[in-house]
Amino acid sequence: MSNALRWLLWLIVAVVVIAGGYALYTLLRPVGPEPAAPIAGAPAGISDKLARGEYLARAADCVACHTAPGGKPFAGGFAFKLPFGTIYGTNITADPQTGIGGWSDDQFVRAVREGVGPQGNLYPAMPYTSYTALSRDDVLAIKAYLFSLPPIKQANPENGLSFPFNQRWGMKFWNLAFFNEKRFEPNLNQDEQWNRGAYLATALGHCSECHTPRNLGFGINQSKNLSGEVIQGWFAANITPDKQTGIGAWSEQQLSEYLATGHAPGRSSASGPMAEAVENSLQYLTPEDNQALVKYLRNIEPIATDSASEVNLQPKGATSSSAILPGGQEDSLGRRLFAGDCSGCHQWNGTGRQSKYASLVGSTAVNDPQGRSVVQAILKGTRISIGEQHELMPDFGAQYSDEEVAAVANYVVGQFGEKQGKVTAKQVAEQRKQ
């Protein structure tokens, strides 16, 4: 027997064994019991199924991934730019041709909780790895709400993935390696409020999808849960209760206000994807659910990360400046650019003019020596709408060169974080693509 034939036979045997193992796993895998009330579901005061579905769809932030910028809600087209290509959020309106109008209850539940739709496996850009913990009743309430909305006929864009990532069947093996299909189970050592917060954070809110580092296989690294990750060029901060590098030094009021409005006095203002999460989802939580989420985040395992990013609440550059007169750093390109385009809103002492959202002192973004979110804000701008209040920072991506973006980002990190900025023109060029 030739070596080539021998290798071919071994390959066939390996494929058969792996396929058989996966088939056996799908039959025998433990999925856990259905979550029981009152942990699961919308607040008890919302009894109408459509109202429950609307609340849950907002808590799950469905609109963010299934709506293109400037597009119709839930009609799809949002682009996820990943290292291996681009994936587009799909149309989840009730249109029977281009949406999910022809899906049965079981098909919808399976897609949301197992990542398998009528046309095959979904990619984990759809956070079924978190939604798997949802109760069936909650998933079907979301479906009922989506089906109550006007159907929108809009074809889904073709994904732009390179081989082998464009082979959906390969997701079966990814799931085998990285997907733990299990319903939410309350922690009996914690009270009802904490467990409610856990359900909101881990299942509905899928916080770990953005705030937890990924491994080489793009699976979530649970050993570093919520300790921070880069998402679409923005740095999703450490939200564990570590006092130096997480949110452990925040007061409960600061955290509650940040979740409800996107701004915490003396701390951060939400930008980028986090601003979208607050705008589309978190601001609509009931006060009780807001407090449950706060309690959960304040009472999980703290994880210390890079101490170089520890927030400085009294940076010398800001404290030595007034609102209109700069102190601190010497003249530089970054300082001149800040003077011309930034100081009018942010002010030299970083307190912000007219809007609290323009404050910079205490921000996790300006305390990151790599300046990732600062660069994104300069390149892309950022916006947030809370109720009738609309806040906007314009983008400067077309106006500034890569060198200029790096210069002003490093100035901001130095002036308002008292850190040595490490942003380079090469980094900026890479972030422009994201």
What are these regions (language model features)?
Residues R29-A40, T67-T86, P118-A198, T202-A203, ...:
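Flexible coil segments in periplasmic/lumen-exposed cytochrome c-class electron-transfer proteins
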Residues A42-F74, A79:
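Short extracytoplasmic
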Residues T86-A94, W234-T240:
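Acidic/histidine-rich, surface-exposed loop or edge segments in extracytoplasmic proteins
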Residues I100-G115, Q119, G248-S251, L255:
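Aromatic- and charge-enriched surface segment that lines or borders ligand/interaction sites
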Residues C62-C65, C207-C210, C342-C345:
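Short cysteine clusters
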Residues S2-A36:
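N-terminal type II signal-anchor transmembrane helix
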Residues L259, V361-E404:
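Extended, polar beta-sheet/loop recognition surfaces of beta-rich domains
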Residues E330-G371, Q376:
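C-terminal structural cap/anchor segments
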